Amino acid sequence: MYTHRLTLILATLTGFCDDALAQQAATLAAPPPLAIAGPEPEASSPLPVEQVVASIGRGVDFLTQSQRKDGAWGSAESQRYYGITAPIPGAHNAFRTAVTSLALVALIDASSQLEGDRLAAAQSAIEKGQDWLLEFGDELRRAAPDAYGQRRDSHTHQRTFTLYNVWGHAYAIHALVSLYDRAEGDPELQAKLKSALEYQVDRLRRCAFLNGGWGYYDMVARTKTPSGSPISFTTATVLIALQEAAELEVSFPQELTQKALDSILRQRYPDFAYAYGEYLRFHPRIGINRPAGSLGRSQVCNLALRMYGDTQVTDEVLRTWLDRLVARNGWLSMSRKRHIPGESPHFADFSVAGYFFYYGHFYAAKCIEELPAAEQPFYQDHLANILVPLQEKDGSWWDFLLYDYHQAAGTGMAVSTLVRTLHE
């Protein structure tokens, strides 16, 4: 009993110290030297604007032609093998909501580059997708308790509880904010969209982790308040979405926001690589936590912290990590489209999973927007040169096989990214 109490006291004190150090780090004047040291890629030859716009158009065509009759994108239908836990129906509600939202955001982002029949098809798809999100978006929630124990994790030997709904809530917020802006002049529709937005934000409040932030598995006590390890990039994704919701005066509890920020800061290393999750933060030099393993995470984590006032995420830090993404892109691309049945998604070098590829570039494009206008074309050209050649013959992009969700997800992210590579 004494030992148990002592352990709890030490854990509590350690948590307080960690939070204090994390908050202090966020207010320091300058980033550590390692955070602004790295490769310096040369400029790339810009692709013709017409080529990039044509690529965007083909991506839009794929999205409008692959939309389901009910207005959503993606499904659980597949004849292929996948090694990812996805208990029904919760996991698939989450996947479908997330990819539908990403497709909607992409179509809205791309609309300014479209005309004629292609523009008409995109607008029709947006209307159908909006109807679906308004009708079914409130069915997304944390998986039912019977999802507990769907499988036993081979590494921890603990029951796994999936929280994929977090991704659906976050990307639904992005879509609803974009749809709200699009509905300017229609207060009745805007009221419906804002109500749907409030639902998604409230659901994120309910599934915030005990230690702060969010993750997509709970492999510890499986309590009402998730007690597992917060995941750095999941938390950053949610925080960025919540910042967008706040612009429409949909608020989120400040104490939960601060706990989430503290969680990310606890996972940040001096080079501004980020641990995959808090459960790995005391292993700074394992592959997944080194800069090459963090290529797909550092962009989103840097962006989230900067949006919430972290003065250490300077322009120089953003440039350094964009330079890393460009110069070391092969590390991120190594597992793209290489899912091997029976293998962990993290089988590649530095444990980089395929699903980080378009995700990493999606947030890199948003980091570019944070830089001075004169510096943006250098990185815009690099991203366009990376993404355009990877487009599939059917107009899609994808990086990780996931039932029938991967093409809509990858295409949505790629289209939104390419729109941001066009010089103003």
Predicted segments — roles?
Residues 1-3:
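N-terminal secretory signal peptides that target proteins for export/translocation
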Residues 5-19:
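Bacterial N-terminal signal peptides
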Residues 21-424:
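Preference for long, amphipathic alpha-helical scaffolds in soluble/luminal domains
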